[in-house]
């Protein structure tokens, strides 16, 4: 297992405060959202995996925002389809 240094990850993000926010969002996605890791897990915790993904350039704030927007649009489309189906059956 390769060690992740905060400095390497900070260089990808810009500052350590944004790094904490991005890593926490990504770790939460893996922990509670059922999202798969983009790097081999190697028995690491979600926070370490998130830092490794950031360090490798696989996860950025823009990537997280785009994924969340897409998921929200898909959820809204499913809800609209369900409402339309209910209204159509009446």
Swiss-Prot record:
Reactions this protein catalyses: RNA(n) + a ribonucleoside 5'-triphosphate = RNA(n+1) + diphosphate
Pfam family of the protein (one): RNA_pol_Rpb6
A single GO BP: DNA-templated transcription
SUPFAM superfamilies documented for this protein: RPB6/omega subunit-like
Enzyme Commission number: 2.7.7.6
Family label: Belongs to the RNA polymerase subunit omega family.
Name of this protein: DNA-directed RNA polymerase subunit omega
